[in-house]
């Protein structure tokens, strides 16, 4: 904790503690009120409540929490993460499951940027330090192709391409049951789940979300789909197909059958970023990068095909 002490200025006399503290330290009123409620604010050595009034000349003492350590993408060799394509502007990786795109609060596992750093890639684009080069992301539990910008030119061009939806993003998803129709479009807005802030759901006031799909192969208990995302919302494929009562196999968060997941040997959702196609940021030529299925997804398909 860091201590701050100061006399109350005349101009703040009579003001509520949370309001005056917010003005003095540049905090939000909510943050200032929280400090008072935690007993971290004193006036002349006496704990002050958030609604107490400031007195001119009184000694205001505040215990501030230490600033969190900056997020770091720790360089580490990542088993199974291979380079699918690389040049002076971009690098495309085959991201394994259980790997995050970049460092974030609460995540202590490996990251794509950490793996690239360990492999000798130097990324110095603009943007927040722990997200340098990141132009799109994949869920931790989703495997497949992910492109990272190395040059500032690529970062600018690809950020714009993803924003304006000129990147062709194809996923393969193994879902429970058989969607009807076998090919179609899901147009349903996605927002935060009301009961679980770490989940998403179809919500009336959610963000516009559009998913196109075609059935590639039908099994007794599941269907393999080719999915084309027109938008790119967090958990979009998982939420859309769960809403149709066809969750991704293995996706227990969104209602998948745990018995089927166990039978298929899945400990994560069967969802794979199969390909990305876009105009190269340097010369505009079309680049298409394809990722093969990892072993766990191949194993699940082998079991299903054996049951046919």
From Swiss-Prot:
EC number(s) stated in the UniProt entry for this protein: 5.4.99.-
Superkingdom per UniProt: Bacteria
GO biological process annotation, one example: enzyme-directed rRNA pseudouridine synthesis
Protein keywords: Isomerase, RNA-binding
Pfam families: PseudoU_synth_2 (PF00849)
Record carries keyword DNA-binding: no
CDD domains reported in the protein's UniProt record: PseudoU_synth_RluA_like (cd02869)
Family matches, as InterPro entries: PsdUridine_synth_cat_dom_sf, PsdUridine_synth_RluA-like_CS, PsdUridine_synth_RluC/D, PsdUridine_synth_RsuA/RluA, RluA_PseudoU_synthase, S4_RNA-bd, S4_RNA-bd_sf
NCBIfam families (alphabetical): rluA_subfam (TIGR00005)
Name of the molecule in the record: Uncharacterized RNA pseudouridine synthase Rv1540
Originating species: Mycobacterium tuberculosis (strain ATCC 25618 / H37Rv)
Lineage, opening ranks: Bacteria, Bacillati, Actinomycetota, Actinomycetes, Mycobacteriales
């Amino acid at each position: 904790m860091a201590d701050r002490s100061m006399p109350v200025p005349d101009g703040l006399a009579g003001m509520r503690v949370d309001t005056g503290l917010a003005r003095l330290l540049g905090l939000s009123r909510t943050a200032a009120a929280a400090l008072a409620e935690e007993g971290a604010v004193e006036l002349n050595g006496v704990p002050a409540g958030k609604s107490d009034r400031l007195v001119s000349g009184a000694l205001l003492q505040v215990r501030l929490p230490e600033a969190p350590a900056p997020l770091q993408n720790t360089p580490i060799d990542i088993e199974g993460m291979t380079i699918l394509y690389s040049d002076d502007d971009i690098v495309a990786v085959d991201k394994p499951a259980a790997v995050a795109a970049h460092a974030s609060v609460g995540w202590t596992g490996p990251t794509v940027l950490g793996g690239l750093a360990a492999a000798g890639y130097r990324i110095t684009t603009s943007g927040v330090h722990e997200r340098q080069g990141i132009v799109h992301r994949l869920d931790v539990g989703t495997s497949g192709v992910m492109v990272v910008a190395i040059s500032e030119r690529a970062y600018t061009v690809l950020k714009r391409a993803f924003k304006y939806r000129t990147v062709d993003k194809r996923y393969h998803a193994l879902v429970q049951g058989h969607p009807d129709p076998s090919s179609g479009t899901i147009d349903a807005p996605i927002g935060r789940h009301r009961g679980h802030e770490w989940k998403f759901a179809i919500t009336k006031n959610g963000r516009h979300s559009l998913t196109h799909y075609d059935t590639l192969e039908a099994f007794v208990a599941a269907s393999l789909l080719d999915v084309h995302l027109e938008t790119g919302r967090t958990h979009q494929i998982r939420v859309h197909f769960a809403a149709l009562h066809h969750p991704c196999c293995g996706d227990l968060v969104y209602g998948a059958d745990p018995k089927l997941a166990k039978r298929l040997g899945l400990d994560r959702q069967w969802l794979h970023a199969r390909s990305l196609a876009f105009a190269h940021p340097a010369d505009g030529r079309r680049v298409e990068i394809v990722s093969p299925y990892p072993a766990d997804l191949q194993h699940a398909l082998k079991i299903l095909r054996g049951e046919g």
